[in-house]
Structures are given as C-alpha cells and as structure tokens.
Amino acid sequence: MAGNCSWEAHPGNRNKMCPGLSEAPELYSRGFLTIEQIAMLPPPAVMNYIFLLLCLCGLVGNGLVLWFFGFSIKRNPFSIYFLHLASADVGYLFSKAVFSILNTGGFLGTFADYIRSVCRVLGLCMFLTGVSLLPAVSAERCASVIFPAWYWRRRPKRLSAVVCALLWVLSLLVTCLHNYFCVFLGRGAPGAACRHMDIFLGILLFLLCCPLMVLPCLALILHVECRARRRQRSAKLNHVILAMVSVFLVSSIYLGIDWFLFWVFQIPAPFPEYVTDLCICINSSAKPIVYFLAGRDKSQRLWEPLRVVFQRALRDGAELGEAGGSTPNTVTMEMQCPPGNAS
C-alpha cells in the first residue's frame, strides 16, 4: 500500500526503510505488514507507470459508479453498499496514484515525505473499509434471499446506511491505532505493539472478514443452483456480489500468503511488494467492470446507456407474485418505493 522504492533492513529496527527519503519508517509497504530483515530489489521503473494507468482507469470507473448510484439510479439497500464501496476504492486508488506520481518524478524532501505519509494512512483506511463492506453486503443479501419475508418485516429502514457508517468509523479507528503504535511509538525503537497490530490486522482480514464473506456467498451459490434446476433465472445482484467477493479473494492471495508465511512460520515474504500492491489495485478497479458485465443485456446489439446497465445489475430477478404469491424480496420492494423511502 505504499511507495515502490527499494527496501533495506536496518539493524535493530523491524521497520522497512526507503533509502533516499526521510528517516520515517516505511510502514505500509506490504499492505499493513512491517516485516523484519527483508531486503528486496526495487521494482521495475515501468511498474510506476502501470500503477498510474491502472489507478486512473479505476478512478474513472468508480467515479461513474459514484455518479450513477449516488445521483441517477433510485437507491436501494444494496446500491448504498456499492456506493460506499466505490468511495473506498476511489480513496485507495487516489492515494496509490499520488504515490506513483511521486515515485515516477523522484520527488524528495519534507513535503513529499509528508504527502507519502498521508497517502499511507488514507490507503490503509480505504482498504480496510472496502474489505469490511464485502461481508456486510454478502450477509445482507444472503438474509434477503433465504429469509425474504422475515428479512423485509424485521429489517430497519436505514440499516445499510448505519452499517456503512459504523464500518467507516471502525476502519478509521483501527487505522489511527496502527498509525499510533507503528509510527509515533516506533520512531525511537522497535515496539512489540506494532507487531501485535500487524498480527491483529491479519487476523481481522483473513480469519474474520474472509469467512464472513465466503459463507454467505456459499449460500448464494446454493440458491443459484436451486433456481437453475427449477429453470428460473438467477438474480443479477447475486452474480455481482459473488463476482466481487471472488475478485477480492483472488487478488488478496499474495498478501495472505505473505502474512501467513511470515507470522506463522517466520519465512520471509516470497512475493515482491509491487505484486501485492498491483493485485489490490486490480481489485479496486475491477468492480465497475463487474457491474457492467452483470448488467449488460446480451440480446441488445445497440449501445445502451450506462445508467440502464448499472440499474439492471441491481435487479434480483424476482417477480411479484412468483411461486403462488410469495413475499417479494427486499430489492424488488425497495425499487417500488418512492425515492425518499429507500435506505
């Protein structure tokens, strides 16, 4: 999550340092890990341009998602989650783009170091927020599919907004704690608190968030298979959520392997830092493509407005009165409500 500079392990200091920059510890280079005694070759210079191009494409795509989901498409509980996901991705991609510009131009000095520090904090916070939103939207979608009647009657009107706000606050709190223990307390001497924070973040992401997003997705997969056997069209919204979780799991493999090998077996990370950063950037840039592919109508040969495509991606495929007048699920009922009543 940090800049693409060469790494040198300083004696007596667990934090990786960037030579030629300031003496502040380079803490967020591998996502959130501060690995001891890792000496890595600098990434190829072309990687900075690849990062910059990828971030700019992702910023354009997520910017369109912010515009359409925020101002053009009628809101429903799941579009609110996607809106906050796009906001987190924009923040992370922006911080990574600034890093790429600074590294490409070779900017040095106190001000450049300050911008890098701000981008590290911003990137970590946005990354944690985006990861924590995926289990929330997966669990809510699973509840709306498996228990539609109970879910619609019991669900608070503003549940999506409240959950997103809480996740933003928790991500900011965890980021501040990590910054405090690993930057302010780690300037003088290496501290065990920073290592504990790294372990805590790994447990939070890989042992808590990942299972919480995978289990609801397994339930959605079973639901999709049951509908396929009954020759019913599956919900596009299910495909969107399954695709987003799959992209995250695939893109986080390298980061997870690095963390697991080091903290469990004390084996140095096998992958270069820029590989894990590139995978995270791909994950943040891929969501607009997922919305587009899920929402496009293959039977339409002519060009369709993006608003129509994105709105179609939110459909859940349920028909009112399906299965002998069964209760419609959340998204169908929300889309029929006036715009001011969506939560």
UniProtKB/Swiss-Prot annotation:
Mapped to this chain, the residue ranges on the Extracellular side of the membrane are 1-44, 105-123, 182-198, 264-273
GO CC, sorted alphabetically, is: nuclear membrane; nucleoplasm; plasma membrane
**One Pfam family recorded for the sequence:** 7tm_1
State which ranges are Cytoplasmic (membrane side). Answer: 67-82, 145-160, 221-241, 295-343
Q: What's its membrane topology?
A: Multi-pass membrane protein
Give the matching CDD domains.
7tmA_MrgprF
| Protein name listed in UniProt | Mas-related G-protein coupled receptor member F
